Every structure is written in structure tokens, then in C-alpha cells.
UniProtKB/Swiss-Prot annotation:
Its EC number is 3.1.1.31. HAMAP family: 6P_gluconolactonase. Gene3D superfamilies: YVTN repeat-like/Quinoprotein amine dehydrogenase. Keywords: Acetylation, Carbohydrate metabolism, Glucose metabolism, Hydrolase. This is 6-phosphogluconolactonase. One of its GO terms (biological process) is glucose metabolic process. Catalyzes the hydrolysis of 6-phosphogluconolactone to 6-phosphogluconate. Belongs to the cycloisomerase 2 family. It comes from Shigella boydii serotype 18 (strain CDC 3083-94 / BS512).
Length: 331
């Protein structure tokens, strides 16, 4: 398995393309100049395209991915109804979902043969919309509205329209600020990192009565932390055994172990990392974690070690200015 790491640096308007080898070392293979401040990125389900959101002219750009080395070639673009904060796709590669924090909306862009061709639906009134996360069954879109302390739930129709479910939302505690999400591989649990109180909520997708319920909330910060809380990103290993969340004020990544059924998180430790870690990701082997420092302008590669999933630094690399997003593609 070959792996390519993409790093988005909006201040220098670049994507750095790296080869990740089996020992966790990175080799720079390409630097792409992007026509705009590039922020969120996602790889298409078939691994043929990288979709990126740019501003100040709000667009989604599609780059064709070379199957041999992961190099990028521009392919298409499509306008968006707000500044792109987060970008994702459905599991079949039919739609791109874009959450916009500033516009307070989530949009759906239709894909034709992998290329974006236009917005088919927009839902407004989502104050602080920070991500759009498709459920494992490809039917429910979870959309955290950070400023409203709620996660809105939509059914995605066959033509890409979003229909509010019943119930239409789940709520966090007041002042939590739900931000980014991941799902357990067993498809029974979701995990949401809350920006404003730096916590992680565990959501059971279906209890015996068919409801969605928050079954655990854990603080991601050390006990003696008294500064402003400013959590950012969350990721889980492919085997579902280890979960990671980061905070930008403390510049740390918190390590959690996950119970076998996915219902319980246990805090295992803290890893100091790059200054202001806005984004990170886990590779497809589950052996390495790559974190980007928005203020250090560097990325660090860590090996995931032992039963606890603790992080051991393997190397640091210079990238563009203000790196914000990390994506790993296996090909």
C-alpha cells in the first residue's frame, strides 16, 4: 500500500504533497499553487480526486490524483454559497457536502463522474456550522452548529436534497460548541469534539428504542489547565481502538483508548505537538498520525505505539504558511 499525505496551507495558498513510507518518513513530491486560500480537503471515495474548498472566492476545486504517486492535476471547480469551513462526500461519490461557519449553512454539490457541477441544496440557519458528516449507512448527515450547541440531522435524498429528520437534532450541554466528528468502524457510535469546552461526546447511534443518545462526555484537557479552551480536530484509527483530539491553545493531542464495542473512551495521555494544531489525521494503516501547526508552519509525524496508542515523534517537516488541513490517501 502506497500512501500520500496532502497538507493545505491557506496563507501561502499551497498544497504540499508527500509520500509516506512504511517507516513513517515523508518525502516531498509536489507543491501545488492553489488559486485561493485552501482550507478543507477530502479524497473522493474512489480515490480519483481531491476536493478542496477555497476562499475568498468561495469554490470547491477538484484535483485529479495520479494513481502511481498521488500527484495532483487541476480538473474542475464549482461555486459555493459560503466560505468553506469543512468538506466531505457521501460514500458513493455522488455529492460533496460543505459546511460554512461564516455563512451559517451547509450545501450539497452534485458530482458527475467525480467532478463538481453545481449546488443542488442549501440549508441556512446553522449558526457556526463547522462540519458535515455522513453516517456509515450513507443516509444521515450530521451537521454540528457550533454556536447553537446542536447537531442537526438530515436525510440525504437520492437527488441530494437534505430533509430534516425526526428528531431533527441532538443537543450538547450549553457552551460546548460541537465542531468535528468521526464514526466508529462498527457503525454504532459517533464521537464529536466540542470546541468551546474542549470535550468529546460519545453518541450512540441506535439504542434499543431507536434513539440517538449521548452516553459519555470526557474532558480532553489536563486537570490543571486553566487557560482558554479551543479544541479543533478529532480522528480515530481504522481498527477503532484509539481516538485522538487536539486543542490549539495548549498545543496538545489527547490520546484515548476505545472500548471494544465503541461505547467508552478512556484517557491515556497527552502529546505536546506543533503550535496551534488546527488539523491532523491518522494514516490508513493506523500506525502513524500527522499533525499540522498553524503557527509553527511545520508538520510532525508520530508513530502510534502500544496498547494505549501513545504517540512517538518520528520527524518534523516544513510546509506552507499556516497549515490547517491534513488528508491521507492510500492507493
Amino acid at each position: 500500500m502506497k500512501q500520500t499525505v496532502y497538507i493545505a496551507s491557506p496563507e501561502s495558498q499551497q498544497i504540499h504533497v508527500w509520500n509516506l513510507n512504511h517507516e513513517g518518513a515523508l518525502t516531498l513530491t509536489q507543491v501545488v499553487d492553489v488559486p485561493g486560500q485552501v482550507q478543507p480537503m477530502v479524497v473522493s471515495p474512489d480515490k480519483r480526486y481531491l476536493y478542496v474548498g477555497v476562499r475568498p472566492e468561495f469554490r470547491v476545486l477538484a484535483y485529479r490524483i495520479a494513481p502511481d504517486d498521488g500527484a495532483l492535476t487541476f480538473a474542475a471547480e464549482s461555486a459555493l454559497p459560503g466560505s468553506p469551513t469543512h468538506i466531505s462526500t457521501d460514500h458513493q461519490g455522488q455529492f460533496v457536502f460543505v459546511g460554512s461557519y461564516n455563512a451559517g449553512n451547509v450545501s450539497v454539490t452534485r458530482l458527475e463522474d467525480g467532478l463538481p457541477v453545481g449546488v443542488v441544496d442549501v440549508v441556512e440557519g446553522l449558526d457556526g456550522c463547522h462540519s458535515a458528516n455522513i453516517s456509515p449507512d450513507n443516509r444521515t448527515l450530521w451537521v454540528p452548529a457550533l454556536k447553537q450547541d446542536r447537531i442537526c440531522l438530515f436525510t440525504v435524498s437520492d437527488d441530494g436534497h437534505l430533509v430534516a429528520q425526526d428528531p431533527a437534532e441532538v443537543t450538547t450541554i450549553e457552551g460546548a460548541g460541537p465542531r468535528h466528528m468521526v464514526f466508529h468502524p462498527n457503525e454504532q457510535y459517533a464521537y464529536c469534539v466540542n470546541e468551546l469546552n474542549s470535550s468529546v461526546d460519545v453518541w450512540e447511534l441506535k439504542d434499543p428504542h431507536g434513539n440517538i443518545e449521548c452516553v459519555q462526555t470526557l474532558d480532553i484537557m489536563p486537570e490543571n489547565f486553566s487557560d482558554t479552551r479551543w479544541a479543533a480536530d478529532i480522528h480515530i484509527t481504522p481498527d477503532g481502538r484509539h481516538l485522538y483530539a487536539c486543542d490549539r491553545t495548549a498545543s496538545l493531542i489527547t490520546v484515548f483508548s476505545v472500548s471494544e464495542d465503541g461505547s467508552v473512551l478512556s484517557k491515556e495521555g497527552f502529546q505536546p505537538t506543533e503550535t496551534q494544531p488546527r488539523g491532523f489525521n491518522v494514516d490508513h494503516s493506523g500506525k502513524y498520525l500527522i499533525a499540522a501547526g498553524q503557527k509553527s508552519h511545520l508538520i510532525s509525524v508520530y508513530e502510534i505505539v502500544g496498547e494505549q496508542g501513545l504517540l512517538h515523534e518520528k520527524g518534523r517537516y516544513a510546509v506552507g504558511q499556516g497549515p490547517m488541513w491534513v488528508v491521507v490517501n492510500a492507493h
